């Protein structure tokens, strides 16, 4: 997997690790319209699958038409997201990327991390295939950003992933029980050997 995507996957996996399948279903403040930790992950996974489908179509059909030009709005969004790494606020997710109750089984944090890695890796293999076949040409059309090259697609998924990493962290802080801190150090050698702290005077 490309290093820039690997970093996002590792951060996501670390954030959900240790959460049980009950906690990953909880909504902040009990409000159903606020996504649970699993729903945040599902949204990302659906995005990876949608991108993978577009890449597979392009690999099967051949090059994207060079007549396909980006609009001024698409150029502006590319500048904002791909160059400055900022997602515009208030933009609703596509219907295809909205988590639907029951479409995924309830799973724990480790399984969610594995799911993110599996889907990201599958998408990245298609990025590699497109780069080999099309080079630096645009390979697929993003619904908002227009036609993108492989490097731009990777950049988008990094920015999008980091945006939802912040959301995921906030969700877990609100719904997860307090984690018990690990002991700073184990028992000392004296404690292990049961040596008395003071010896009686002779």
Please give the residue ranges for each predicted region:
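Aromatic-glycine hotspot motif
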Residues: 1-202
